[in-house]
Amino acid sequence: MDAATPGNGIISDVVFVIEGTANLGPYFESLRKHYLLPAIEYFNGGPPAETDFGGDYGGTQYSLVVFNTVDCAPESYVQCHAPTSSAYEFVQWLDSIKFMGGGGESCSLIAEGLSTALQLFDDFKKMREQIGQTHKVCILICNSPPYLLPAVESTTYSGYTTENLVQKIGERGIHFSIISPRKLPALRTLFEKAMPVGLIEPQPKDYSQDPRHMILVRGMVLPVGGATSVPGVMPPKQHISQPPLPVVPPQIASAPSHQLPPVQPPYMQVPQQSTLTPAHAAAHSAVEAAKNQKNSPSNRFLLPNLNPMPNAPAVGTPFNQPPAPTLPPNASVPKMVPSPSSLMTPASQSSLITTVTTGPGPAPVQLQQQGAPQQPVPPSMPITGAVGGVQAPQPSQPQIGTVQLPCTQTPVNGNKLLAWSGVLEWQEKPRSVSVDNNAKLTRSLPCQVYINPGENLKTDQWPQKLIMQLIPQQLLTTLGPLFRNSRMVQFHFTNKDLESLKGLYRIMGSGFAGCVHFPHTTPCEVRVLMLLYSSKKKIFMGLIPNDQSGFVNGIRQVITNHKQVQMQKIDQQRNMGAVQGVGAGSVPANSQGFLQKQPGTLPVGQAVSQQMQGQQVAPGMPSISQVAMMDEQQRSQNLLHIRVQQPQQLASQAPPQATQSSVQAPGQPQNPQPGAMLRPQNPGANPQLRNLLLSQQPPQSSVPQTQQPLHHMQQAAQSMLPHQAMGQQMQHQAPGQLQLPGQSLMHQTPAQQWGNQMQQRAPIPGTLMMSAGPRGPVPQSGLQQVQAQSVMEDDILMDLI
């Protein structure tokens, strides 16, 4: 087959014809490594070196032709490099090829490339006139069949089809070879038609390093294909025999950290083998499994878990029965059952992180499935017994979880550099229902920060402990540009505290991000670091924004906007609750803070107790339609803007009495509204005073709305003490109202109970309180309301500021 070898001293003319489209791009690196570089070494007599030159005419000449498809117009169909005698320079030409275009084409312009190659051989013939006969080789590297079109760009061979050109190549004694990542019948036909005249070829050798490659060679020698001759690839027998060796029971009984790691290297190498078919591999695995079952009686409880295909759906059923108490309350059992497709890929090893965080129970099953994914098992064997046999010993479960996390995270950090090591601390709400809502549970985990090689991150000034605060990821959607302009590091956590690690996975996987704030006392360039969890890659990534000040301001603005939205939602819920109260048969609630307007008297303590019992309508109350009409009449006359002088005018017309909204008929209880002023009633109230007050309302005052409530309070404070009796109830101020100087604040927070807070007490001398004297209603719209803020957001905002 090979007419010349490097030791014979025969000079060669070599032309590489390569398809320069994106169809070949993904495969070119593999073809270059396994076939092109060995071919160059064959013609060069050794590896290419920068100082190797065979002379302009005396040594081996290399030339490169790159052809495309018809979609490359208006560019030329072919790019040609002039011949060179330097193998090193030729390799640089190969590395500079840009594989692009051809995505919408199923064929390529092979005829254009071969016609240009024939022109190059014509030029070689003129250059070699003084040397004589040379060894001529044309190598075609492509991944698509040829167009049924003749060559058009070549001047000498214009009009020749691809078959005509390969026949021309064979007639001129040029050895034609084809290297393709796919077995294409059209290319094999070209190889057969390019056979030199009068040459009887022996049985071709198999040079393919991958069973999918088609390697048809003439005129040169390549390394023989197969897994045994490729450096770094283990023989097939070692691939098949190693996966069944690690078994879970020895790991549980002994040290699991020494048994589990050998599973991964042979499993990662299984896709590299190319000589055994899947059927042979499965048969060999079945034989090995039978031997292990015979030698180790304890394995019979675990062998049913080795078949991921037919029994995978049945594995999920026992998980909900006996091992359920070992899972966290929010564990998602379906996540523990991997799909058959994920078990057959090496990338599925990283999915063990999710399995450990959701619960350590089913972990041995997944380990066995990954260790030997091709071992068949009779369907009649009980799956439930297998799972129960593995999970019965409770002390063994933390050991299995302890083994899995480092093994799954170690490959991620294999090519990264350790930049910082310390402790990460955060707070989360306890999962117990009986615990106070404001209670916080502090957790911490040892962690390491890794960076990519070549990155420069100064961590020598970082504190030993990083404090992380949780923030919902939905609040960070507006900070996308700041996230994109950031550096990325990787966090790796040590699983010394398995409970804290599971809690971190649970929180970060449920829509929260970690805001790591560096204190100002630390002399480092980083102030804020965002910790995010990638559920797709199963890793924790840290984003360090380049614009630190802009990022801090952005988070501050996001939190401010979020609080404003929350306040608006709370106000809307209050209004909706008032409307729903009317529809349910309760006394209509005035959303603007008015007092109730039904005539009658009722002690304050009884009114408060009725209010806390759901605001039920008492016997003898007016109908809902009448109350609604009174509400509408009050709104129409704008009682929010009563002048300061109104109480004085009313005092001249009627004796001291209760306000218009609190006058009720005898025997009719009052149902106060939350946020209204509660005060004792005047026994001498006139039932017909309401109509008098509504008919004599003066026009709107020019006093600003925001100042009117204060005028009312000042006017009432001047005449409070003479009207307040020893047995009267002290007044209640609505939540959220401002407190006057010297005024005692008597309101309750929403989280407190009213039960024992309404005892009667004597007035405190020197203290100004809201009296029961005649005055207008006290509106709430002009008073400032302060909404309680969540503890988590306050902590974040305080630390960021």
From Swiss-Prot:
Name of the protein: Mediator of RNA polymerase II transcription subunit 25
Q: Where is the composition biased (Low complexity)?
A: 647-676, 687-710, 722-735
Q: Which family does it belong to?
A: Belongs to the Mediator complex subunit 25 family.
Principal location listed in the UniProt entry: nucleus
Q: Which gene encodes it?
A: med25
Motif annotated as LXXLL motif, chain positions: 689-693
Q: Which locations, inside or outside the cell, does it occupy? A: Nucleus
Region of interest (Disordered), residue spans: 647-735
Q: Which organism is it from?
A: Xenopus laevis (African clawed frog)
